[in-house]
UniProtKB/Swiss-Prot annotation:
Keywords: Host cytoplasm, Viral RNA replication. The gene is M2-2. GO terms for cellular component: host cell cytoplasm. It is found in: Host cytoplasm. This is Protein M2-2. Mediates the regulatory switch from transcription to RNA replication. Acts late in infection by inhibiting viral transcription and up-regulating RNA replication. Inhibition of transcription by protein M2-2 requires phosphorylation of the phosphoprotein.
């Protein structure tokens, strides 16, 4: 099994996350500022930000963004290659 495809639009760094769009053949889910992007408080492996800090307040580098999105997807149970993940940044 391979991981989902992750696309970052536009591809610029440092950046802040505006929205995360998760798509598959039968499902589309969007995370944005309205339904604030909080990461799992119980994830002790991520030391880049405090557990309750929103994604859009962080100025990401390329590798930090990819690593954190992969952790976020695993937290959501999205680990199959049937998904495409679009990360909209500003």
């Amino acid at each position: 099994m391979t991981m989902p495809k992750i696309m970052i639009l536009p591809d610029k760094y440092p950046c802040s996350i505006t929205s995360i769009l998760i798509t598959s053949r039968c499902r589309v889910t969007m995370y944005n500022q309205k339904n604030t992007l909080y990461f799992n408080q119980n994830n002790p492996n991520n030391h880049m930000y405090s557990p309750n800090q929103t994604f859009n307040e962080i100025h990401w580098t390329s590798q930090e963004l990819i690593d954190t999105i992969q952790n976020f997807l695993q937290h959501l149970g999205i680990i199959e290659d049937i998904y495409t993940i679009y990360i909209l940044v500003s």
